[in-house]
């Protein structure tokens, strides 16, 4: 995949997606056809992350072509980024605690074989290894694949979610502190207590068009547990 850092390219991608592919988005968005075929998704997130194009602009442009009812799923996905940013801004201790935990865990796992094999794409899970290499080479992963990846990392490879979140931020062109951190927390089961995401063999096969076989995962793992809860921190913008 090629991401050219220019506003002209961002607008071109947006227009092409709306004209050619948006009408089928809700039906095809969960499929990962591989890095050479991203026609079913917009691939605009790197441009949003770096401020080249805004969520508002994307939504307004899409609504100029299709009605809200035909656009609803796409708009929902765009607004998740905005929601996560607002959620984290109101609870900044989630981010500061994550950084503290990450520093401790990195030292503990620096020689851990499961971790070293995971980041090198040398596990016994073919699809996971493929995604590690794809992430490093393309600096992008399909959103559904990010969920599978995180679930395998946490529940099958039994690695801390904090290390996985860092690994994504090291490589993703669209790495966003809020979406990434809270997304990993959600998969683990600590963002919404007791609700986690477990990747399954049948789901991966279905939504990758059977590109991968013999996917042996822990599909019965319980959610991770966190004793911490975070209250909204009142924002004070009075500079007087």
Report the location of each language-model feature:
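C-terminal catalytic domain of photolyase/cryptochrome flavoproteins
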Residues: 1-143, 151-240
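Short, solvent-exposed turn/loop segments enriched in Gly/Ser/Thr/Pro and often Arg
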Residues: 147
């Amino acid at each position: 995949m090629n991401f050219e850092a220019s506003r002209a390219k961002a607008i071109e991608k947006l227009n092409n997606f709306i004209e050619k592919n948006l009408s089928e988005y809700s039906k095809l968005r969960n499929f990962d056809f591989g890095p050479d075929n991203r026609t079913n998704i917009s691939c605009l997130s790197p441009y949003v992350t770096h401020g080249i194009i805004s969520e508002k602009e994307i939504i307004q442009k899409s609504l100029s072509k299709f009605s809200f009812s035909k656009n609803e799923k796409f708009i929902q996905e765009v607004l998740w980024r905005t929601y996560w940013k607002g959620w984290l801004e109101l609870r900044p201790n989630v981010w500061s605690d994550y950084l503290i935990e990450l520093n401790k865990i990195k030292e503990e796992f620096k020689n851990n074989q499961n971790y070293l094999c995971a980041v090198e794409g040398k596990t016994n899970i073919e699809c996971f290894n493929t995604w590690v290499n794809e992430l490093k080479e393309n600096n992008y992963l399909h959103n559904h694949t990010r969920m599978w990846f995180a679930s395998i990392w946490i529940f099958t490879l039994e690695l801390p979610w904090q290390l996985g979140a860092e690994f994504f931020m090291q490589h993703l062109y669209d790495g966003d502190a809020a979406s990434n951190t809270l997304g990993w927390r959600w998969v683990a089961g600590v963002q919404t207590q007791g609700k986690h995401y477990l990747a399954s063999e049948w789901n991966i096969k279905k939504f990758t068009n059977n590109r991968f076989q013999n996917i042996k995962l822990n599909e019965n793992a319980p959610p991770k547990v966190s004793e911490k809860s975070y209250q909204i921190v009142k924002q004070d913008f009075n500079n007087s």
